[in-house]
A protein has these predicted regions:
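P-loop (Walker A) phosphate-binding loop of NTP-binding proteins
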Residues: 9
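Walker A/P-loop
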Residues: 15
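NTP-dependent small-molecule kinase module
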Residues: 103-104, 108, 133-163
Length: 163
């Protein structure tokens, strides 16, 4: 079974891409945010940033169990998915986005200034990409600034999974 993770700064198009790919590749879509909330894999809720503070170690244990028990190919969607150990992941897709477009997307979500700045900085500094590379993942970068050609992305993924 194959496992693809989709990571990137919030607002870069992870979920849209992951859901589209799960359909075209016939992979099972895993929504990590739902798992975090349903399984209460967080230490607290940060009121200021309006976000859960996630226990990444426990999240990885839950995701590893899902991967090991799965009889299907998986696409795991989360800005935290790149923390999974390399041995469980066949391909790591990192979504990137033009900073002006990302700012518009985050403003539509009504992010407060501090959270907005934090996410824009993370994108500018390539935090998710660098951390994915540090974790030795096989990385495919997808720019989601423009309309995506899912067929071309599917072909790229299939090629990468063969290598």
């Amino acid at each position: 079974m194959k496992t693809i993770i989709v990571t990137g700064t919030p607002g870069t198009g992870k979920t849209r891409l992951a859901k589209s790919l799960s359909i075209i590749l016939n992979f099972t879509y895993i929504d990590v945010n739902k798992i975090i909330k349903d399984s209460k894999i967080y230490t607290k809720f940060d009121q200021e940033k309006q976000t859960f503070i996630v226990d990444v170690k426990n999240l990885n244990k839950v995701l590893e169990k899902i991967i090991l028990q799965s009889k299907k190919n998986l696409i795991i969607d989360s800005h935290l998915s790149h923390y999974l150990p390399r041995k469980y992941v066949d391909l790591c897709i990192v979504t990137k986005c033009d900073i002006k477009i990302l700012k518009m997307r985050l403003n539509k979500r009504k992010y407060k200034e501090e959270k907005l700045r934090e996410n824009l900085d993370a994108e500018i500094l390539d935090i998710c990409l660098i951390e994915a590379l540090e974790n030795k993942h096989k990385v495919l970068i997808i720019d989601t600034s423009r309309r995506l050609n899912i067929k071309n992305i599917k072909d790229l993924i299939c090629q990468r999974l063969k290598n």
